[in-house]
Amino acid sequence: MAAKGRMRRIIRTARSLPTALERLIVVLEHRYTPIARFRPGAFEGWGFLWQPAVLGFIALLLILAGSCFVESPFKLGLPRTWFFGAPPSLAATNLPTNETKLMIAISLTYGGLVLLLRVWMRLAEVVKLHAGAPDRVLYCIVALWSIPMLVAPPLFSRDVYSYAAQGEMTAHGISPYIMGPFSLGSSPFVDPVDPLWGNTPAPYGPLFLYLDGLIVRSTHHNQLMSTVGLRLLELAAVALLAYALPRLARALGRDGGEAIVLGALNPLVILTLIGGAHNDALMVALLVAGLMFAARRQLWLALLFCSLATAIKAPAALGLVYVAWTWLVPGANERVTRVREFPIVVVRMIRTRLRPLVAGAVMSTVTLLICTYLAGFGFGWVKNLATPGTVRSWAAPATALGMAITGLCHSVGLDVSMTPILSVTRLLGLLTAVGISIFLLWRAQTRGWVRSLGMSLLLFVVLGPVVQPWYLVWGLLVLAASYQGREHFWLLALSITSPFLGLPGAHDLLDGLVNAPLLLMAAALIVLMGALLVPLGRWTQWSWPEVDDRLERLGLTAE
């Protein structure tokens, strides 16, 4: 009984955490930001949208300006990797770093990032409380915010250079499933590749390799133009995402404008999928398009698009499972009231689902076979799916647990290897994600199958061997069209905090602020504090119609 009581208290505490966090945020914003002086007012229509559009554009221009410096730590500092902001020669990379330019670059980038997150969070709250934002205007904002990231060099990651090198390998008939980019020898495609992935085979699906090689061939094997082509491919994917998200949301009975803001305008999408040119954009865009068709009961198109998404990156296969499993004949769902009924109900449900499961398997198999034939390198990508796990990061809970256990053992004098411990903790994380995902799949019809899919994708990322900001978009973009209740808070929280995962330059910024000349220090602080505290405009009051009630419950007043 005592154990049951403790378990109930733990569950009660876990359920109260979102409320406690929300109250803490309300108190902090009331006391330390300009929101305290706003009084809720009547909503005056959507004419104000130009204000967040311009503010977000300015924020992204600050990030672009920060990337223009050769010293910027947010991009690759090698010659001929972009049209500007690159050193003139390889010898110039060995010159001493200009500390002044380094701090300016970091201050501009961090200031722009903070301002962008503030603008987006307020806009997300406005469209949540006032449905009906026009798609056409929001599409214009997506286009406007994309411009600085199209001009900027690839930011926050060097993965796009690996894509280009793998495309060059594909164009020359070298299998990226067997060899790494360093097999190209002295090719200009090799220099920008992160050494961590230089000898690592590709884990990407055959469709992406086919498109990758096609882009390299169409640019006549020019490394810089291949990088541009890959970014344009991801931009097209974001355009497809912006088209499919509101239609998926409306098919689920939700507001399409809010889905665009939470999805296509999400800072993670703008910064990592367009700015970083990650192929996750193509995968998740095809997946969301497939979910849109599934919500409209157009199963064959849904299976086709989900299969194409799987041929980009394997995690999209989870979408295939959900689409096939939830395509039901009438009366296919049954509830289990007694334990002995469980086998009977399982057999009955499998029979009713046999047709969609077989159809899904056939469609996905045929699509993958065609893509594999076009790429011409077989199914080697399947055995390479664990490649990202070579990274050891504290951002992944399963990996962090293994590293912490290893460190603890070393501190008490036990000489243990980290590799087997990491294997165990990562396996436990994977099994936990699989177990919860099976439960979500089983209850998909009652909990909302698109929402359950989004949660499953997030689980596999958070409990996986490595967590990257662009991995989180898999689940966040699906939840953008299907979330319920407090999931909105967690969606915002993940979107706002994850851009800072592994973001470089923080140490350099703090060191520069301590040691910089007084005038430069003052200028950097003005940029950073201005981005954090500058009033966004009176349109933000429409995102807080409930703020008075919440403050009263906390014993505060909105004066």
Show where each model-derived region lies.
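Start-transfer (signal-anchor) and selected internal transmembrane alpha helices
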Residues: 1-61, 89-148, 445, 450-451, ...
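Intramembrane catalytic core of multi-pass membrane enzymes that act on lipidic substrates
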Residues: 131-231, 235
